[in-house]
Amino acid sequence: MLTRVNEKKTGEAVIPAVRIAEAGFPAPFRSGLEYSSPARGTWNIVHTGMLIPEAHQIYVCGAGCLRGVVLTAAEMGTMDRFSTVAVRENNLLDGDMEDLVIEGVSDIIGKLPKKPPAVLVFTSCIHHFTGVDLDMIYARLRERFPEIDFADCYMNPIMRKSGLTPDQLMRSRLYMPLHERPLNSSSVAIIGNDLAAQEDSDLVKLLRAAGLRIHEITSCRTYEEYQEMAESSVYISYNPDAVPGGNMLAERLGGRHHYLKFSFNEEEIDEEFGKLAETLTECCSPCEEEENPSGGCPENKADSFAARVRNALSVIRAEGKAAEAQAVKDTLAVIGDTPVAIDYTFCPRPLGLARFLLDNGFNVKKVYVDSIPAADRPDHDYLQNNYPDLMLYPTVHAAMRFASTENTEGEGASADSDREKVSVLAVGQKAAYFENTKHFVNVVEGGGMTGYEAVTRTLGLMKDAYLHEKSVRDLVQVKGLGCEVCVR
């Protein structure tokens, strides 16, 4: 007999929530039947894979599973770089799963108007269940097409909670096709991000001031430009899901991976950028080749470079702290005690953001988060002790399908004429949808922000969101916010 899951009854609240004082770490909510909200700005494996210029994606799985990825490719206008191989029942019964992948991929490559330099082959859950020999499959494909770089990718949601997540795997596969080449001590790479690092971010400002060449997959327009990333002496990641890929890249190509922890905390920002400065001075030496043909910098040049990095960092810190203090003052003067809701899609440290805002006088009421990131553990503990009534809400719990109908923001005057009309300010798309507010920050995955610039930009976006309404319906349903960078 079928039973209704979380049936909505008149006068009964079914929306799950927990005070942070009682929230477990890292999972404050029980796992079960899941709901997917219409807020679709975060990227999926199709979007991320399209970052490799000129590469072709081939998905091998059941027809039902193909619908979502096909729609993603169609919506972003990249169907010319996308193909599928459907697994049918007879393939399971006949035991020809390996042959299906090999021959299916080969047939697609043979029919393309031009052979791509790289092919990303996505196998799925069914290959995992049936014990398909993936090593043999890729060995055969590489024998047939030695001029093509193949990357083993996965559309395997059953592995979400064991080992590397699909997102971590996909970010690591972004750099598998890179060929080993001599390292250039004047070059660094920013890796593992869907969105480009902001030019005025503290990270980019530091690297530019140091005179280093910056490689980033989002700026590559050709496969050859993409291959130039392999010359980097340091790979810098600031998305936690990019860390496994950065470690793999360092092991394979020989550069050093440096994880720059994303933060809103002043002491942590200073500490993290101090560590990065040390890595740069140890691994990089931007000298002209004619000055020292044997490679590296003469000792006096190395000392000069280290001093340049230290001086640049000192300026960035001083300017950043001053800008942060002013931004807090200006934003708080506009927003006042307006309730604030944050969700995890905005940045890698949602509890870190909540802590920063609460400590600076903002009225943060809710954080939408299904699991708490490891980096947020100190913030979780701090908030439990200092702001125990902060409420945590899930985003995938089945009962959350009722959330947006329970929150209704007043219609009528804008914030410019009537501050009372802003019932809640949302930071992130899911918070905007669940709170049903027109006043929200429309950013995903940190938006390429780092350091003090991340703090000041976030505050500026909050002020703008308070003053100007947006259409939730029109904006949050756009799949893969910023994915137009993939259309080359």
Report the location of each language-model feature.
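An N-terminal assembly and electron-transfer interface module characteristic of large anaerobic redox
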Residues: M1-R488
